[in-house]
């Protein structure tokens, strides 16, 4: 079975073809980096117009990569939320139009579910498992009991961690997106040079907060007269270290909540998995620290490859396959900007 996946929820236009044997036959991502760079962030209207322009080319390139025709496609899956509504509508309607023209099933995919299930495209891990989903717009601990069966154990009460990376990069005039740039500069800096607040780490549960950290970084930057390269590297290292410490601290509580929740609702596996996914999971320092923590608590730390952590259509196609196999899909769906995984 060959499934086309379409992703357009933010600033990357992506189309992929994945089959039911977990093979990525084609995977095309068209970046909108140059369109948004002058604004140091994503402009929704510009993103939607770029998706409209890029989708047709991306589809053609995907079919060329796969060396197949539309007649070889069985199902169309497209991100239908959450995300920037203009882009979500463009991609979802594009997918529905193709499905209608081909007489094939259309599957509306939750973008976050794509991230949650992406790890199963490369690793045949069984349910249940714990996910730390970290991206530009979301930061959540999720108990994954099965396809479409999710419990949010904790989440950010204000800003997402990816947004904090981008804001810090903007303050330092480093460019966009901020995550990869800060990670690179942090490797040259002293992570203990500046003390930054470990927000909510003393509280029960596993909710998170990054607004206080953002404010502290802003105040720190404005207090320094000369931002030399060494100072910038130290700020990046201290910021990244603090973010990771917050996530590690809250992960400990999340593991306890996950085990409690599963003991009441599911027979937990002998081998437990702690998955980190989402765009920020491409950060190698964060990934390794989460793996180390997972091992300490008897879990196997797992993450999708970096190219499947950032927004991509292969994870959307795979989520479509998972939902099709579970018979959990409907062709009657309206794209939406907000869509919790607990509503699936």
Curated annotation (Swiss-Prot):
Biological process per Gene Ontology, one example term: tRNA threonylcarbamoyladenosine modification
Cofactor binding description: Binds 1 Fe(2+) ion per subunit.
Listed name of the protein: tRNA N6-adenosine threonylcarbamoyltransferase
Family: Belongs to the KAE1 / TsaD family.
Top-rank taxon, per record: Bacteria
Function: Required for the formation of a threonylcarbamoyl group on adenosine at position 37 (t(6)A37) in tRNAs that read codons beginning with adenine. Is involved in the transfer of the threonylcarbamoyl moiety of threonylcarbamoyl-AMP (TC-AMP) to the N6 group of A37, together with TsaE and TsaB. TsaD likely plays a direct catalytic role in this reaction.
CDD domains from the UniProt entry: ASKHA_NBD_TsaD_bac
Keyword set includes Signal: no
């Amino acid at each position: 079975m060959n499934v086309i996946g379409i992703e357009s929820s933010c600033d990357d236009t992506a189309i992929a073809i994945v089959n039911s044997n977990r093979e990525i036959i084609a995977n095309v991502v068209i970046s909108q980096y140059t369109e948004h760079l002058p604004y140091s962030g994503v402009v929704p209207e510009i993103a939607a117009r770029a998706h409209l322009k890029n989708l047709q080319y991306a589809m053609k390139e995907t079919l060329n990569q796969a060396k197949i025709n539309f007649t070889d496609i069985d199902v169309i899956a497209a991100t239908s939320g959450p995300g920037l509504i203009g882009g979500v509508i463009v991609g979802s309607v594009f997918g529905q139009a193709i499905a209608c023209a081909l007489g094939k099933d259309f599957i509306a995919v939750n973008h976050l579910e794509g991230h949650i299930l992406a790890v199963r495209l490369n690793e045949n891990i069984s349910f249940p498992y714990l996910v730390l989903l970290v991206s530009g717009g979301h930061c959540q601990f999720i108990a994954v009991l099965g396809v479409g069966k999710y419990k949010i154990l904790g989440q950010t009460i204000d800003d997402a961690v990816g947004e904090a990376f981008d804001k810090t990069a903007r303050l330092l005039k480093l460019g966009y997106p901020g995550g990869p740039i800060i990670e690179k500069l942090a490797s040259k800096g002293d992570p203990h040079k500046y003390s930054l607040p470990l927000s909510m780490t003393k509280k029960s549960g596993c909710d998170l907060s990054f607004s206080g950290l953002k404010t502290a970084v802003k105040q720190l930057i404005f207090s320094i007269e000369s931002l030399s390269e060494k100072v910038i590297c130290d700020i990046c290292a201290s910021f990244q270290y603090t973010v990771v410490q917050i996530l590690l601290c809250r992960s400990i509580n999340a593991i306890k909540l996950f085990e409690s929740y599963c003991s009441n609702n599911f027979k937990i596996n002998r081998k437990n998995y702690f998955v980190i996914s989402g765009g920020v999971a491409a950060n190698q320092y964060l990934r390794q620290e989460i793996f180390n923590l997972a091992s300490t608590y008897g879990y196997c730390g797992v993450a999708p490859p970096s190219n499947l952590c950032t927004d991509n259509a292969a994870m959307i196609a795979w989520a479509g396959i998972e939902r099709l196999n579970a018979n959990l899909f409907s062709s009657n769906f309206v794209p939406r900007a907000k869509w919790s995984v607990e509503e699936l």
